[in-house]
Amino acid sequence: MARPSPLCLLLLLTLLPPIVPSNSLLTEPPFRWRFYLHETWTQGNRLSTVTLATVDCQPHGCQAQVTFNFTSFKSVLRGWSNPTIGFVYDQTHSNCRDYWVDTNGGCPYAYCRMHVTQLDTAKKVQHTYRLTSDGRTTYFLTIPDPWDSRWVSGVTGRLYRWPTDSYPVGKLRIFLTYIRVIPQVLSNLQDQADNIKHQEEVINTLVQSHPKADMVTYDDKAEAGLFSWITLVRHGARLVNMAGLVNLSHCFLCTALSQPPLVAVPLPQAFNTSGNHTAHPSGVFSEQVPLFRDPLQPQFPFCYTTPNSSWCNQTYSGSLSNLSAPAGGYFWCNFTLTKHLNISSNNTLSRNLCLPISLVPRLTLYSEAELSSLVNPPMRQKRAVFPPLVIGVSLTSSLVASGLGTGAIVHFISSSQDLSIKLQMAIEASAESLASLQRQITSVAKVAMQNRRALDLLTADKGGTCMFLGEECCYYINESGLVETSLLTLDKIRDGLHRPSSTPNYGGGWWQSPLTTWIIPFISPILIICLLLLIAPCVLKFIKNRISEVSRVTVNQMLLHPYSRLPTSEDHYDVALTQQEAAR
């Protein structure tokens, strides 16, 4: 069984009669009020913003409290912390409302009102606490008054790691919007339709079936003869209806995008060539078209020519000159389709296999269980790849550390060449990435402008989109010129890196010659040796003096140890005088 791609075409709607929606779908309003919780924090030198959670009000309005459920804050790590939120709108002290708002969120003092995370292991939202946690995986942030108009314009708060911290680590923004509720099935179908359109555009660039294919819009593809997955599946749906299949309410028609879209099905008898058929251009119509083989019938029902008579139940016995296939039929000869067959008896083509066939879309009918098992395969564990080149670099570094001159030179040259190649690849990848991002931003800007114009038309009686939402109007500032300038700079750098390797120029001086590459690795060892030779005499002289001094002291101690110094008369007189002074 062929494995379908994830872009399975859920087009059984063309097979089934219109489904009458239930009362719940009819009574449910298509629009709803939705709260958004955004967190903004600084990571290094980059400012990041992420949507932590969303929650919808009741279908008939925001008349009761709502609660956000989310796993964690991005700027506060779970564990050694107690997240605390401070809002400006609910402060009671003037210092908290009027000062330190930009840096501290209105809370540099202990008397400001803070919403500290409270432990709630029962996971029951309490009215008395704004921020709670189950202590393990989930935080609960409650909005007690969702009907207040402040949420429409947006409320900003500061996030602290601890209640005693002086400065916040992130910023929270809560706002309320009126959105259109799209069922999940329709949302999935919209995503699949976008993917199908993208696949059709890729295929149309490869299939040159129209001289002006780039100028044909998506709606005119069927008339222009371009390939379309939608048209293909519609033909398959018609065949299913003609076959009389019933009870297909939970089945899916799928096609594999990696396989040919059409398959040739052998017909049980020859074409009727007596009638007048529409003239078709001569020559090969298509190549490499697979042939369907019925596993229950080992032989083909009918063949015009065959290399082996056992392959076919019946073989054509008439003349094979100037045969034309009617509308919807083709001659299949060795994976090639043609509308005309002209084979003589002595022609080598008479020994090939030629069949009357009809083209059928290559679709597969899956049940819901089969599709779930095919679209969601089991996860595979990733295996680590052993990188031997890393070991080679480590060995080379070891040789350099050991002082092997040849190894050091080879490592230096190979590392320089590898660094140059990687730098060129990085610049080329950066240029391509910037160009791709610029194209995406320009496309998004065009789509946003079209949506803005459509919204202004729909809300013209209410003063436009901005007046209807009560917000300031935002406009897109096109700064694509900066990106284009950066791309030109990267291109110049890339050309400069390529130029020395293709057209070397050694006229700049002796330091730019190839000999410099061989001399540089020897400079450091030579300098170290010269330094050692300069200080070696001083070191040797110092060591010699110290050895002599130690030897002299040792000899004196050994020779004069049995002797002691005798007292003299002067010494005796000095002792007597000292005793007299002490007696006084």
UniProtKB/Swiss-Prot annotation:
A motif (CX6CC) lies at residues 466-474. GO terms for cellular component: plasma membrane. The chain crosses the membrane at residues 515-540. A motif (CKS-17) lies at residues 449-465. Disulfide bonds join C466-C473. Specific enzymatic cleavages in vivo yield the mature SU and TM proteins. The CXXC motif is highly conserved across a broad range of retroviral envelope proteins. It is thought to participate in the formation of a labile disulfide bond possibly with the CX6CC motif present in the transmembrane protein. Keywords: Cell membrane, Cleavage on pair of basic residues, Disulfide bond, ERV, Glycoprotein, Membrane, Signal, Transmembrane, Transmembrane helix, Transposable element, Viral envelope protein, Virion. The CKS-17 immunosuppressive domain is present in many retroviral envelope proteins. As a synthetic peptide, it inhibits immune function in vitro and in vivo. Retroviral envelope proteins mediate receptor recognition and membrane fusion during early infection. Endogenous envelope proteins may have kept, lost or modified their original function during evolution. This endogenous envelope protein has lost its original fusogenic properties. SU mediates receptor recognition. The surface (SU) and transmembrane (TM) proteins form a heterodimer. SU and TM are attached by noncovalent interactions or by a labile interchain disulfide bond. This is Endogenous retrovirus group FC1 Env polyprotein.
